[in-house]
Amino acid sequence: MTQYNLLEIYSIKENLKEYDLDDSVTEKISELFNLLNISNTRSKNMRKDKNNCIENGKWMKKELFKPTQIEKKEGIEEELDNLRALLNKLVENNYEEQKDKIIDCVKSIFDIDDDEKYIKVMERFYTLVINNQRYSKTYSQVYLILLDKYIVLEEYQSIFINRYNDIIHKIEYIDPDENYDEYCRINKLNFQRKCLLSFIISCVECEIYSFNELLHIINGLFDMLDNNLKSANHQNINEEIVENIFTVMQQGRHLILNEVCKYDIIDKIKNYSILNLKDNSGYSNRMKFKMLDILDLYK
């Protein structure tokens, strides 16, 4: 086999003017083009001049790109954006450092003359809470500090429980094959609902809310499930109710075990775990196994 070094290859490249491939090689290449269903002709690239727009036979100068001007927020909106950024950075590891920055930022907001400043702060905090379940305890600790520091916030203290009690009655379901985008939207709402419930449980732990308020939520979930057990059309909604029951029974376990009502609650779960599916068309094996998982937590 003939071999060439690099210098020889460069020399051949510089001096080569024309070279015809053997017919057999050409045929093979053509066969490849046909198999791949691609063209073997090179399209001519038309060079475009910067000023190549023509109107009425005249060259028109291309309009210069104008960057989008982002309006800079000022006053309370700027401070609220700062608060949102600080809250988003809040994790367990930086709690001590970050909480002081958050408190200072909230003070700056409350110093501003704005009739809606308190509810605006609460809305920023609410948005944080419903989108991150992992740090619910950390968020409740910051919330407790703000409540102790600003008595006026007690007027808005029930906002989280009230909203949970509202959205728990708005559970939806859609088949992903029917509308996948809507299915994803509903899944996000389901996740946010459980995040909010986790935060409420954490608030009970640090005594922002009482256990009776949590018990009211638990009994409400049981009532919703009981009302829908006979309805096959509610089976998917019932599964989401059970997911919420599991959340409160798992994350609120130590709270429940310290209360006398634990016996009634556990008995209720036991009854669900042995329900006959044929007699309860709104119930499913998935829910049944979830109830058994809860019982394992309380052994």
Q: Where do the PLM segments sit?
A:
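Extracellular/lumenal mucin-like low-complexity stalks
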Residues: 9, 26-29
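Alpha-helical interaction scaffolds
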Residues: 1-4, 14-21, 38, 42-299
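Intrinsically disordered, low-complexity segments
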Residues: 32-35
